[in-house]
């Protein structure tokens, strides 16, 4: 029997994390755009829609998925390792840049606006 490529858990976790971030935004007020292909630090752009009008207000996002987040302070805060280059990239953005960390097993999305 020929050997076939194997699927990897990181692809599954990443795919599920992107899906959970996408569906955490109300479609009546936000348009979600996923970036695929070469990863330069932006996984998605979320654009605000108010009163059925586009206002060019956007959030860029980096999405990280995990099955075992390190929870601090009764589960409201997590610790997650992140590369300094990712933080620097987000800080250099001219629009709001948010780091999304997703607990894919419990379907919980944590977020940190980097410019705050």
Where are the model-predicted features located?
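Mixed-charge (Asp/Glu-Lys/Arg
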Residues: 1-40, 46-116
